[in-house]
Amino acid sequence: MAIDFCTHNNYLRSNCGAYELLFWTMSDCQQDPSGKTNTKPVVWATSTVKFGWNVEGIYPKGTDGTHINGVCGSHDGQLLACGDDYGLVTLFRDPCRAKHVPRAYRGHSEHVVRTLFGDDDQYLYSIGGYD
């Protein structure tokens, strides 16, 4: 599960294990069924949801997406980092389209559960499962 907030705190977006990308209005804490349309002009303060048009290229062809454990966008909006079940941290340009070639780095013996860019995007941190 992941949650992102917009820069003006009007909207929140979330995803879950049921592969749903949901949008919520912060003023009344209600789900917005038209959120995909209503949030087109919105700038997101964070980028951690693993479903959406800007992350569609993180899933290799022929996979169901369950191996991607976490996504994190850089603060400058240029990069996406993913952690997966194979111990890899994969770095993509943001937005990530299908057929974009990422850079993959092995740093864990087990699955990578989360990635996080430092405040100035100079460092990328990753958290492993059972390392």
Segments (PLM) and residue ranges:
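WD40-repeat beta-propeller superdomains and closely related acidic/aromatic-rich repeat-like regions
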Residues: 1-131
